[in-house]
Curated annotation (Swiss-Prot):
Organism listed in the record: Tropheryma whipplei (strain Twist) (Whipple's bacillus)
Positions contributing to Zn(2+) 1 binding: C58, C60, C73, C76
Coiled-coil spans in chain: none
Subunit structure: The RNAP catalytic core consists of 2 alpha, 1 beta, 1 beta' and 1 omega subunit. When a sigma factor is associated with the core the holoenzyme is formed, which can initiate transcription.
Identification of the protein by name: DNA-directed RNA polymerase subunit beta'
Cofactor(s) of this protein: Mg(2+); Zn(2+)
Length: 1286
């Protein structure tokens, strides 16, 4: 799809818009006729509305074939067209009563509630027919007639009182007559008293009845006087009488109709002005609410949307192919949930129409309207209000909102990730004979992948007459097909991908080599990059089709071009396992080996002696070398005391490399390849790696490494060591029992004793392992395992933790070699199981962290060479040790390396070492240390002033290539991957200080990284000094109070837990920003007290601390890219005379732009406060609504985008992936795409050898002859095999 638009805007659809999209009204709830299996007319699948189910055929079959294109059948009313229109054409439902869109009144915040200034619960009452709302009021008429109406009311009340008096008088005269009669009849006094009592009760009831009527009239009158537009009134006798008596002065109604009429009369401009005045005049909650309301009102004003569109008279029906019905076995059907939800709406709508036609009572009609509203709510967002509608098996039905949000929603399932053709997958096996840029592709898989190319070649060479017969040849396995496959596979790279693709090295390009079998062969050195092993892992193969894609795969993605790890710039293609065993064996020295002390005139002579059996490869000998580099000097010849094995190893290294005359283990080979990557070209490095791999495998097979139970040597003095520490432990226990120690002190003492005992046993065990022990060889060389594992097998298990995470103060004394007792086995099971559970949880948590990081940083792309801002950040290179000497800062290669200098670097005596603008290399760092430079000013993405993305100068070197980063590099994605990829290696634990669960917890590992990136306030955050001054400490029963008295007599109080470890003493002097208590700081407090640079350093160092503690190297610049995104926003404090609102969170660049505009026009500028936003919040607050909606909270983001008419400028990567554009990064940038190639004379003469003079004249001339026959140029020209012939 070619797209030419520059931005996407989303807005609110009007009733006319929906009718314009529609191809007809859906009137019936039926889907298909189950007898004929054809769609029902006017139903949810009707062909008259949505188009034919068969290509070029009307519903009844009268018109068939494409020659009737566009004809509408007069019999069945179906247009003759392609059936694919059923994916595009929409219908609509004409509602009998308006309904409210649930997104606008049930969202948080409720947009309808803010607009009309109604509480959401009151809004709910109106919409669902539980209360009336006054929608119009004739205030002038009421005011004019108020006196007359009151006189009328008083008259009614007087009449009621007169009637009351008359009724009582009548009752009195009746009573007197009755009593006279009873007295005449000489009735008893009790009987007369009873009659009198009944009569009095009757008169009281009469009076009460009339008083109630009068009171009711008073209430009716008060209600009428208090009526206001937007007022809510329950449906009771008072309001019914208000309507009966004064209905001419106002109009009140229920449901969406009431909301619609309010919205139609709503004056946005007037409301905005009133709210603006309120913001200036009010304080507290009223001001906050006014700001929130104004935000919603302004959204409607800027988008020019009609608020009445939030109430729907018409509902769109999406195309039937997007809510399909599929026939299953046994004649049953599986249908999309949307069909059930639409059916409920249509049924209720049709019933409401019938009730209205019949003139049903209002209460029945209102109930049906409420049910229609609920049906539409369920269609748009099922479960948002009340109980969700469920289908069979009590499963909640998926609504339109559910189709958009979540992992299986439209955004993430179909728009951001698509299945691709020309791909396959298979199990991987090792390919030890492959070169670094090659992979083994099974012949059958290659045949299927390259089938279209083979078909074309068969046709071009006239080996097959047509496509069908060519396909048949391939299926038969004709011998000619294999030759074609060999030809088309040449110079065509394929992409290999292993899931999970945690970083960019998870997809690399290789040149395929055809292999037998069905497994893909993988080069052993790229396993680390893919995190692959050969225990059943599978990999996917993808075929780049276009010439551009092939060029990108070859130049950018070929495995031999991806030797360095983008996270730290160190080589990732390192020999491992058996290769290291082979190299270690090859370079080992055995002084007593055969042939020791001999001298040879060349390596060849030594090899000859070895072949004759006179010399061992490990024997120390003297060999004469020519053209050798020793101690940094190149010598024509030199005799070196070495071994033949080391000489063989050095032959694998490139010319000019220093001679390696030491035992080669994992660390040595790592530093060798590190140096190779710095000094030599990629081609030479790749060739050297292949040679080292081959040498390693060759000698690993000859090393004879085996492991037997006898190789596991337990230290004989173990029992003696244990007995000594057992005695110490008993002493501690006795001290505890007599009350000299607390339980906490006892536990700490025991843990300390047994930790020391375990270390002593481990030392003794290591001494027991001879140098030629194979387990010793494996661990020492770095091929496999570590001494901790060996200690568990041969020494003792040591201390383990209980389920609470506390260390059990009694160790497991047995080793696995000796076997554990039942008790020891039982207490060690918890740790083993916890490890497996943690791994599963970590994988999910780490994946989610990576997703959030990618989302927040996805639009950080290198956009320009230099932003022009030369101020950077100062970083230490050396520090002065206790000995007074300068030492290299421990992590200089992860902080200073690869950056651009912001200023010249000079020695203490003012000699220039490096100029501003140069990139810092490893060699340059060494020169800084030698010259005594303590710190350097470097450019950083934290200070980059590029409006969009970052600039090349501020970012510095690309760690993946070792060269200055190119324009178009997606450094944000690389940063997110570099931080997220090792996430599974981090611990999940929260450590307990002092071994007590109630003590202060120190969050570490992955949760700590999340805490920092989300800028959360830590639990029991450590306070920081808000001024220079003196601290005094007050002890309370449960807590301590630290009181800081500043130098200008201000007092600050901090309450901390009693058990918190203080960093200050009573009377200590502190400076602004000093940490007062051990623990984590609140980033927001650091920003408030110390400023933006301090919070940047705190976040970067905090994340690095976690990764370094786990031995994971990451360059600071990756963390800085994320921190830059976290500090993009500011909160407006005073909006001045700008369009911003107080309290609004706004992008810094937008804030500065609006302020510049105001300044230019002489208006008052705004002021703002810097904010640190967590990565989730920063992702949702991005300029791109497409990116935010596809991340999280889809419905909320879309609702806000719709009411404000948000425009998406399509700057980031995600939004361009969603709409199918090339991403604005790498070769997708216009700077690389809008390039006109200029042919060089050599290229012309090589391409068109016979027509050179004509072409040169053509190129030199100002204009081209329109009659020139360009096709003649290709005569006699050798075209590539897959050149597309028209």
């Amino acid at each position: 799809m070619s797209t030419s638009f520059k931005e996407i805007r989303v807005s609110m659809a009007t009733t006319e818009d929906i009718r314009r999209w529609s191809y007809g009204v859906v009137k019936k709830p039926e889907t298909i006729n189950y007898r004929t299996l054809k769609p029902e007319k006017d139903g949810l699948f009707g062909e008259q509305i949505f188009g034919p189910t068969r290509d070029w055929e009307c519903g009844c079959g009268k018109y068939k074939r494409s020659r009737y294109r566009g004809v509408v059948c007069e019999r069945c009313g179906v247009e003759v067209t392609q059936s694919s229109v059923r994916r595009e054409r929409m219908g609509h439902i004409e509602l009998a009563a308006p309904v409210t869109h649930i997104w606008y009144f049930k969202g948080v915040p409720s947009r309808l509630g803010y607009l009309l200034d109604i509480a959401p619960k009151d809004l709910d009452k109106v919409i669902y027919f539980a209360a009336y709302m006054v929608v119009s009021l004739d205030e002038e008429g009421r005011k004019e007639d108020l006196q007359d109406l009151e006189n009328e009311l008083r008259l009614d009340i007087k009449q009621l009182r007169d009637a009351c008096d008359a009724s009582i008088a009548s009752a009195v005269s009746e009573l007197e007559r009755t009593i006279t009669e009873l007295q005449d009849a000489k009735t008893s006094a009790s009987r007369i008293n009873k009659v009198r009592s009944e009569a009095e009760n009757k008169m009281a009831n009469i009076r009460r009845e009339y008083d109630d009527k009068i009171e009711h009239l008073e209430r009716v009158w008060d209600s009428f006087k208090a009526l206001k537009v937007g007022g809510l009134y329950a449906e009771d006798d008072v309001f019914r009488d208000v309507q009966d008596r004064y209905g001419d002065y106002f109009d009140a109604c229920m449901g969406a109709e009431a909301i619609k009429r309010r919205l139609e009369d709503f004056d946005l401009q007037k409301t905005a002005q009133e709210l603006g005045v309120q913001i200036v005049e009010c304080r507290g909650q009223r001001k906050v609410r006014a700001i929130k309301r104004l935000r919603v009102v302004n959204s409607f004003i800027t988008s020019k949307a009609n608020p009445a569109c939030m109430v729907l008279d018409v509902i769109p029906v999406i195309p039937p192919e997007l809510r399909p019905m599929v026939q299953l076995d046994a004649g049953r059907f599986a249908a999309s949930d949307l069909n059930d939800l639409y059916r409920r709406v249509i049924n209720r709508n049709n019933r409401l129409k019938r009730l209205l036609d019949l003139g049903a009572p209002r209460i029945i009609v209102n109930n049906e309207k409420r049910m229609l509203q609920e049906a539409v709510d369920a269609l748009f967002d099922n479960g948002r209000r009340g109980r969700p509608v469920s289908g069979t098996n009590n499963r909640t039905l998926k609504s339109l909102s559910d189709m958009l949000k979540g992992k299986s929603g439209r955004f993430r399932q179909n728009l951001l990730g698509k299945r691709v053709d020309y791909s396959g997958r298979s199990v991987i096996v090792v390919g030890p004979t492959l070169q670094l840029h090659q992979c083994g592709l099974p012949k059958l898989m290659a045949l299927e992948l390259f089938k279209p190319f083979i078909v074309k070649r068969l046709l071009d060479l006239a080996l097959a007459p047509n496509i069908r017969s060519a396909r048949r040849m391939i299926e038969r396995g004709d011998p000619a097909v294999w030759d074609m496959l060999d030809a088309v596979i040449k110079a065509r790279p394929v992409l290999l991908n292993r899931a999970p693709t945690l970083h960019r090295l998870g997809i690399q390009a290789f040149e395929p080599q055809l292999v037998e079998g069905k497994a893909i062969q993988l080069h052993p050195l790229v396993c680390a990059a893919f995190n692959a092993d050969f225990d059943g892992d599978q990999m996917a193969v993808h075929l780049p089709l276009s010439l551009e894609a092939q060029a990108e795969a070859r130049v950018l993605m070929l495995a031999s071009n991806n030797i360095l790890n983008p996270s730290d710039g160190r080589p990732v293609t390192l020999p491992s396992h058996d290769m290291i065993i082979g190299l270690y064996h090859l370079t080992t020295v055995k002084p007593s080996a055969k042939g020791a002390g001999r001298a040879f005139s060349s390596v060849a002579e030594a090899i000859m002696a070895k072949d004759r059996g006179d010399l061992s490869i490990s024997a120390p000998v003297k060999i004469l070398f020519s053209n050798i580099v020793l101690d940094g000097k190149t010598l024509d010849s030199a005799v070196v005391e070495t071994t033949l094995g080391r000489a063989i190893f050095n032959e694998a290294l490139p010319d000019g490399h220093p001679y390696i005359n030491e035992l080669v283990d994992k660390q040595v080979i790592s530093s060798i390849i590190n140096n190779l990557a710095e000094v030599y070209s990629k081609v030479e490095v790749a060739n050297t790696l292949d040679k080292i791999k081959s040498v390693g495998f060759h000698w690993a097979t000859r090393s004879g490494v085996t492991v037997a139970i006898s190789d596991v040597v337990s230290p004989p003095e173990k029992q003696e060591i244990i007995s000594k520490y057992e005695a110490q432990a008993r002493g501690v226990q006795q001290d505890f029992e007599i009350g000299l120690l607390t339980d906490l002190e006892r536990r700490q003492a025991l843990v300390s004793i047994w930790s020391e005992a375990t270390d002593r046993v481990a030392e003794a065990m290591r001494k027991c392992f001879p140098d030629d022990n194979t387990i010793n060889t494996m661990v020492t060389s770095g091929a496999r395992g570590n001494w901790l594992q060996v200690r568990n097998i041969a020494g003792m298990r040591g201390l383990v933790a209980n389920p609470k995470g506390e260390t059990i103060p009694r160790p497991i004394i047995s080793s696995y070699r000796e076997g554990l007792s039942v008790t020891e086995y039982f207490i060690s099971t918890h740790g083993a199981r916890k490890g497996l559970v943690d791994t599963a949880l970590k994988t999910a948590d780490s994946g989610y962290l990576t997703r959030r990081l990618v989302d927040v940083a996805q639009d950080v792309v290198v956009r320009e060479r230099d932003c022009g801002f030369t101020r950077g950040v100062r970083m230490p290179v050396t520090f002065r040790g206790d000995d007074g000497e300068l030492h290299k800062v421990e992590n200089a290669e992860h902080s200073v390396y690869g950056r651009t200098l912001a200023e010249d670097v000079k020695t203490p005596d003012d000699n220039l070492i490096a100029k501003a603008g140069e990139d810092i290399s490893g060699i340059m760092i060494d020169s800084f240390i030698a010259a005594g430079v303590e710190s350097v000013e470097v450019r950083s993405v934290l200070t980059c002033r590029s409006k969009v993305g970052v600039c090349s100068a501020c970012y510095g070197r690309s760690l993946a290539t070792g060269a200055r980063v190119d324009i178009g590099d997606a450094v944000g994605i690389v940063a997110a991957q570099s931080i997220g990829e090792p996430g599974t290696q981090l611990t999940m634990r929260t450590f307990h200080s002092g071994g007590s669960a109630s003590a202060v917890d120190i969050t570490q590992g992955l949760p700590r990284v999340q805490e920092l990136f989300e800028a959360r306030t830590p639990r029991a955050a450590a306070p920081i000094a808000e001024a220079d001054g003196t601290v005094s400490i007050e002890d309370g029963d449960r807590a301590r109070r630290l009181i800081l008295k500043s130098d200008n007599n201000e007092e600050f109080s901090y309450t901390v837990l009693k058990r918190a470890q203080l960093r200050v003493k009573d009377g200590s002097r502190v400076s602004l920003g000093d940490q007062l208590v051990e623990g984590s700081l609140d980033p927001k407090e650091v920003l408030r007290v110390k400023g933006i640079r301090a919070v940047q350093e705190y976040l970067v160092n905090g994340v690095q601390q976690v990764y370094r503690s786990q031995g994971v190297p990451i360059h600071n610049k990756h963390i800085e890219v994320i921190v830059r995104q976290m500090l993009r926003k500011v909160t407006v404090v005073d909006h001045g005379d700008t369009s911003m609102l107080p309290g609004e969170l706004i992008d810094q660049s937008r804030y500065q732009e609006l302020n510049r505009e105001a300044q230019a026009e002489g208006r008052k500028t705004a002021s703002a406060r810097q904010e640190v936003t967590g990565i989730t919040k920063a992702s949702l607050a991005t300029e791109s609504w497409l990116s935010a909606a596809s991340f999280q909270e889809t419905t909320r983001v879309l609702t806000q985008a719709v009411i404000s008419g948000r425009r998406d400028p399509l700057i980031g990567l995600k939004e361009n992936v969603i709409i199918g554009n090339l991403i604005p990064a790498g070769t997708g940038l216009s700077v690389y795409r809008d390039v006109e190639p200029e042919p060089r004379p050599e290229a012309i003469s090589r391409m068109y050898p016979t027509r050179r003079p004509e072409i040169e004249n053509l190129l030199e001339g100002d204009s081209v002859d329109p009659e020139f026959d360009f096709s003649s140029l290709t005569q006699g020209l050798e075209l590539p095999d897959d050149y597309p012939v028209q």
